[in-house]
């Protein structure tokens, strides 16, 4: 099965977040490659291209470690990126109020409670 570039970018970003969430630092391309399933599903050159694109989109930062090896870190956490994506969807809608109303209607009671709590804190 072939994957689209967007799917590969998401897979690489999720692998990077998983490594960061486990406490890893100075994450190199080989670390990310080892995290992606199934093993051997993408070539190192493909991974480096995807990481470069994610850097261009300002989703990932790269820097040289010891002036030689490249290491990568996400610009936003997984949760921050999810929130940014939701905001982008709302801002792109012709009727954001209706989108929010439909979204809230589909939430579980627990998530609705968390949303109410967040809105109260925002006042």
Model segments located where?
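Short alpha-helical segments that sit at the start of domains
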Residues: 1-15, 19, 77
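Amphipathic alpha-helical dimerization/coiled-coil segments
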Residues: 84-123
């Amino acid at each position: 099965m072939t994957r689209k570039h967007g799917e590969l970018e998401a897979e690489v970003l999720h692998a990077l977040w998983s490594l960061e969430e486990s406490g890893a630092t100075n994450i190199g391309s080989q670390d990310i490659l080892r995290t992606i399933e199934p093993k051997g599903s993408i070539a190192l050159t493909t991974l480096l291209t995807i990481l470069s694109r994610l850097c261009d989109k300002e989703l990932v930062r790269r820097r040289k470690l010891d002036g030689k090896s490249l290491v990568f870190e996400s610009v936003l956490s997984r949760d921050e990126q999810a929130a940014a994506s939701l905001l982008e969807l709302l801002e792109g809608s012709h009727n954001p109020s209706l989108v929010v109303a439909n979204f809230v209607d589909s939430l579980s009671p627990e998530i609705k409670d968390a949303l109410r709590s967040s809105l109260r804190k925002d006042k």
